[in-house]
Amino acid sequence: MRPLGIPVLRDRIVQEALRAILDPIYETDFRPCSYGFRKGRCTMDAIAVIMSLTNSKQRYYYVIEGDIKSYFDTVHHRKLLSILKKRIADKDIIDLIWKFLKAGVMEDGLFARTETGVPQGGVISPLLANVYLNEFDKWAEKNWQLTPYEQQKRRKAGLGNYRLARYADDFVILSNDGIEGVKQAKQEVKDFLENELHLQLSEEKTLITHINDGFNFLGFHIQRCKPEGRWVVHLRPTDKGKERVKGKIKDLTSRSWTWMDEYIRLTTLNAIVKGWSEYYKHTSLLEDIEEITRFTWFRYLGWLLKKHKGSRKHTLIQAKTKTIHNRTRWTAEIREGAITLDTYQWLPTRKELKRSKYMQKGRNGFQHPYLPDENSETPPMDYPMGETGPDESLYTATIGATSRKSRNEPLEMAELKLRVKMRDGYKCVRCGSTEKLAAHHKKGTKSH
C-alpha cells in the first residue's frame, strides 16, 4: 500500500495558492511531450500522438514501455529543490515547499518521516512531480527532437528517430530505429534517470515491444493488425480495464443491494456505463463497449429477480430493445413505468479520432492555457495612469507562446527577447508603439 499524505484543509488552501502561482510559470517550461496534470491536456492527447506515429507513413513501430519504480515515493528532495531554485528566487517559497515535502505521513496511527518522495494526496504534489520529470523531458527533447531535415538525414544514414510521450510517471518512447538502436536508447534512458534524477526503471515492466505485438498505455491496448488485407492500428480497452468496470457493476448488482429502489440503481449503472463508454469512445471496435453494456443489462435483470424473489409477473413485464434518436436502448417495463439502460453503439470509432480535437491540437500545437488565444480579440484592461496590469510580466515572460511560429521557441531565446523589450521600455524603437512587439536583429540576416 502507498502511504498517503493528505493535508488538512488549512494546508490544502495554502498549497492551492502556491500551485496557482507556480503553475503558470512552469507551464512555460514544460515540454510538449508531457500530458499529465496539465491544464488543457488529457490522456487522449497522448493517445492521438501515438496513433499518428504508429501509422504506415511514420512507421514508429518499436515501443519502449517505461515504468519507474515507485516514482512518487522516490523523488529525491534535494534534487527537486535544486531544480526549483532555477526558477524560484524567493527563499520563503522554497522553505514552504521543503516543509510540505518533510511533513511525514501517519501509518497505523504512527508518524513516519518522509525522506524521499512527494506526498500523494497533496494539492501541489502533481505539479512537483511534473517539475521533477521535466528534466527527463528536456533531455529527451535535446537528444531526439530534431528538425525534419535532421530526421531525414538520420534515416538515410540507417539510423532511427525517437519520440517521447509522458503522462505523469507513465511514458512510452516510440522509434523507427532497429532493435539494436532501441536497446541502446533504453539503456541511455536508464542511465540518465539513475545518474541525474536518482530514479530506477523496473526491469520487469520496462519492455521493448513491437507494435504488431501490442502494448498498454493509459488504459488502452494499441496494436497493429491486418484484419482485411491492410495494416491498421487498433485502439481498444485493456482487459484489465474491462474487468475493473465489470467488478464495479457486480458489486452494485449483488444481493446485498436489493433493498434499493430500481430506478435509483439503474441511474447509478447508467452513470458508470456512460463514463466508461465516453472514455473509450474512440476505440476501433465498438464490440468492447457493447460487451460492457450487455453485461450491465443482464446483471441488472438478475438483480431485479433477486430483489423480488424471482417473481417476474409482478415486477418485470418485458425486456426489449428500441431505437430512440438513432440510439439503441434496452428498456424494462416495471410496474408504473419503463427503465432504460443507455447503450453507446452510436459513439464515434477510432476513424473519427483523426478529425477530432485531439489530433488538431497535436498538429497545430497546444495553446498556452494562461495566455489569451491568439485568434481572440480580448480588449485591453484599463488601469490607473502610471500602473500596469498584474499579468504584464507573465505575458511578456512567455514571449512567443501565442504565435504559431514561435510556440516551441527555446526558453533561452524567449528570455533574450524579454530582456531586449525591457531594455527598450516595451516600446518599438522605430514608431514608439507598445502593441504587438516583436524582437529582431539590429541588422537583418539572410533568414530574417
Protein language model annotation of sequence segments:
Residues 1-426, 435:
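Non-catalytic terminal/accessory segments
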Residues 404, 429-448:
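Histidine-centered nuclease catalytic patch
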